[in-house]
């Protein structure tokens, strides 16, 4: 499988489809690179774009305020060399754009987690793996963890708004240590607005864990009709998105998170969800082992340079 010099983006995409299918059965069919800015080099092509968060939006808590994104498709056989050429071309493209040197910017490259052939090129260009998109297929059971007496999992409702926001902010503050998440002055207000809408809606897929009457954990997820934004990242359908899970520090290690995950997984499986996706921070020492025990494994890795101009 090879790409000739001068071969167009559609030819690259066709070859990448074959390559991705051999790497990971959960990867999607690569999308056609049509519309917007498309970069091509021998052996690779990519769509590149730019996202800017709206003031007051909760999206600003999940990363830099301005994100320059490259979505590469590399066919081979020299994946490292082709990706190196593509990243060099993108760096030159970014140099011509305003604002890439501002502090609150990031250059972001999503890359299949199992495609280790590209890792060296990403590192050589100053990109680091910050966030993981992990996947669980329907029916995969998590590791059973005794939760002890007095633990109750129940659906959350509008009266639980304060508890949900408090636990959500604990998660934002904790994850801010690891490079992707940013607690901003208006993050709590933005979270409150979003959660209020969620809890007021039908079947909000939001659960609280209580022990002896005190709230100690939270999980909320997006149903397939809400998760269309992330569904293209995997082949099976329908897709749900586990948006947030939090356990109070004093309650960790006692099976609270596993109990919440089990309740969610039962609901998702009953609803016919084929794959649940979630994000976790690569450097969070708790996330990778926990989510692996719950039946998740890495599907995509977001590689970043901050600010965007720091990319080499």
Where does each model-flagged region fall?
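Conserved donor-binding loop and adjoining core beta-sheet/short helix segment
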Residues: 28-89, 216-238
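Acyl-donor-binding surface of acyltransferase catalytic domains
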Residues: 75-150, 300-308
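Conserved acetyl-CoA-binding loop-helix of GNAT-fold acetyltransferases
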Residues: 78-96, 244-247, 253-266, 293
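Conserved active-site alpha-helix within GNAT-family acetyltransferase domains
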Residues: 113-129, 258, 270-271, 281-300
């Amino acid at each position: 499988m090879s790409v000739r010099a001068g071969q167009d983006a559609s030819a690259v995409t066709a070859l990448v489809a074959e390559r991705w299918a051999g790497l990971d059965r959960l990867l999607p069919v690569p999308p056609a690179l049509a519309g917007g800015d498309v970069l091509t080099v021998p052996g690779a092509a990519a769509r590149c774009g730019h996202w800017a968060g709206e003031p007051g939006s909760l999206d600003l808590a999940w990363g830099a305020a301005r994100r320059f994104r490259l979505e590469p498709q590399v066919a081979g056989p020299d994946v490292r060399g082709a990706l190196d050429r593509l990243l060099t071309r993108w760096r030159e493209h970014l140099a011509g754009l305003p604002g890439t040197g501002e502090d609150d910017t990031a250059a972001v490259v999503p890359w299949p987690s199992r495609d280790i052939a590209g890792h060296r090129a990403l590192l050589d260009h100053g990109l680091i793996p910050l966030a993981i998109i992990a996947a669980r297929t329907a029916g995969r059971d998590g590791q059973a963890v005794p939760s002890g007496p007095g633990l109750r999992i129940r659906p959350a409702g509008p009266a639980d708004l304060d508890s949900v926001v408090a636990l959500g902010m604990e998660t934002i503050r904790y994850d801010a240590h690891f490079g992707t998440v940013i607690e901003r002055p208006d993050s709590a207000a933005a979270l409150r607005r979003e959660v209020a809408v969620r809890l007021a809606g039908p079947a909000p897929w939001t659960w609280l864990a209580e022990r002896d009457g005190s709230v100690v954990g939270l999980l909320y997820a997006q149903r397939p009709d809400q998760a269309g934004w992330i569904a293209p990242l995997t082949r099976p359908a329908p897709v749900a998105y586990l948006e947030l899970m939090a356990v109070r520090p004093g309650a960790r290690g006692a099976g609270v998170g596993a109990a919440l995950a089990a309740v969610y997984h039962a609901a998702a499986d009953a609803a016919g969800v084929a794959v649940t996706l979630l994000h976790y921070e690569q450097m969070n020492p708790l996330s990778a082992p926990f989510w692996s025990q719950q039946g998740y494994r890495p599907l995509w890795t977001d590689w970043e340079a901050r600010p965007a101009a720091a990319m080499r």
